């Protein structure tokens, strides 16, 4: 999705600052490497710093035949920030910590001026559009990667359209991730611990309509124990443990690190008042 100028977007007032007359100064300040990095961000939509560095090594170095150091690339990001062409945020998924970069409104106008083409929608912008937050989007991305690398599923999907399950005329369930192997479907919800209890109850009740195994992944043990477990237990009490037992419902909780190590951190199987720890689970929902 190409960028469409919106005067309400975060940008300076062009009529007051003379942005266009300042473009050449910005271009000189960021140098050739900065121009190439801007072109990569505008044309590829890459937001993760590690991916941008790989592109810089593989593409930019190939085009120029000059070696590029990681230090040079990080200085390039500093120059792009100092000229207000990009913004940088830190993301911690519990599995990895990294920076993401995105074009500012001024950066998009700069790209359109020099590259004669509107920037494509970035990964950052897509996550804002599709998910509760950018952080949530990257948690889903890392969870999907783990599940794909395990090789236990024939397909692992995260698209809202393809994952949508109609429950009734007015209600639908859209799991964050759907893993399919043979004729089995596993539904994963990736939690940041930001839902209020009412929203969480609604999510769990919808999932209980479509699956007997409710699978939650979160970023770390702290969020799992302080937020996710509390919310799960409240929902179980509200719906009724015996009712869920009759449905055969189980709730599985894990972190990204535990999932990577083939572990479910806790399981609520409705036959006991307390959750059980169960390690070594290699397929979603298996006991």
Stretches with model-predicted labels:
Residues 32, 46, 63-142:
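Interdomain/boundary linker segments immediately adjacent to catalytic/signaling cores
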């Amino acid at each position: 999705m190409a960028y469409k100028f919106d005067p309400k977007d975060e940008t300076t007032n062009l009529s007051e600052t003379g942005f266009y007359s300042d473009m050449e100064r910005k271009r000189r300040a960021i140098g050739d490497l900065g121009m190439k990095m801007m072109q990569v961000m505008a044309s590829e939509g890459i937001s993760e710093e590690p991916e941008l560095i790989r592109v810089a090594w593989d593409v930019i170095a190939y085009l120029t035949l000059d070696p590029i150091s990681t230090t040079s690339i990080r200085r390039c990001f500093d120059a792009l920030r100092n000229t207000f062409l990009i913004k940088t945020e830190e993301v911690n998924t519990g599995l990895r910590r990294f920076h993401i970069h995105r074009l500012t409104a001024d950066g998009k106008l700069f790209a359109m001026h020099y590259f004669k083409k509107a920037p494509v929608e970035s990964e950052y912008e897509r996550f804002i559009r599709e998910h509760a937050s950018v952080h949530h989007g990257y948690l889903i991305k890392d969870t999907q990667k783990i599940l794909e690398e395990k090789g236990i599923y024939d397909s692992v999907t995260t698209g809202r359209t393809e994952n949508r399950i109609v429950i009734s005329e007015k209600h639908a369930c859209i799991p964050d991730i759907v893993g399919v192997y043979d004729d089995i479907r596993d539904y994963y919800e990736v939690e940041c611990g930001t839902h209020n209890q009412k929203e969480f109850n609604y999510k769990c009740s919808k999932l209980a309509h479509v699956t007997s195994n409710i699978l939650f992944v979160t970023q770390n043990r702290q969020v799992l124990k302080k937020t996710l477990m509390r919310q799960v237990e409240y929902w179980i009490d509200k719906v009724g443990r015996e009712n869920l037992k009759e449905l055969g419902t189980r709730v599985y909780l894990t972190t990204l690190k535990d999932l990577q190590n083939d572990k479910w951190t806790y399981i609520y199987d409705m036959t006991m008042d307390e959750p059980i720890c169960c390690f070594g689970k290699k397929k979603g929902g298996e006991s």
